């Protein structure tokens, strides 16, 4: 909480956007767009073409094509376009999901099951690349934020 006060004193604003859900916020983080632009506007949304409810954090198949659902370029795609490699990491169970394909598109996804594994992979990535973009997602940190309802 002390950091929030320090930021306030320096007029630094941190905003996860609205709605403040993991799905919307992560898509905004990786695209630089607000939910109304990237299309992931909440945890669950009804697909207007099929009427099916889509839970953004579950697998979307066969109802939604991730490339069509989330159309904004990601930071990883922008980096790749100028020759900069990208890495994204999360739990192994996220590999190949619609959300991973939509939000981390353009990055090489590596599934990991521990923070040690993430940091080892991160170190290897930067040992092999002079520059790059890397994103690490650790769900326990996300869950802690939700459970403490820290504002």
For the regions a language model picked out, list residue spans one by one.
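Short, intrinsically disordered, charge-balanced linker/junction segments flanking boundaries
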Residues: 147-151
